[in-house]
């Protein structure tokens, strides 16, 4: 027995399941980029990049890591990246990073915004929303 309405519902359900699976795959592929003196300029020179300046020994920095990763999945129009200040002192000195965590937004290679401290999800949300396309 062929019911066209039932077939239509099945096709819609299948399309929804495929779309959901593709979204899940896309979400899992989004990651925070580790920056160093070799890749910093090439990564920050194109589009929007929010950079987290952090250190291994910094408790507030470590608290921000999962928040930063969640926000990277939410705001896909922005690249999210990290600079370990102990391993990349030249980069942190270049941008005058004196407190950590410090978050700097770059647009096409130019610094356009900055926040300091463990700002949590509201802080990252605020800066990301400000540069939403």
PLM segments and residue spans:
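Short cysteine clusters
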Residues: 58-61
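Proteins that catalyze or organize thiol-disulfide redox chemistry
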Residues: 1-50, 56, 66-74, 78, ...
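Rossmann-like NAD(H)/NADP(H) cofactor-binding core
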Residues: 51, 81-84
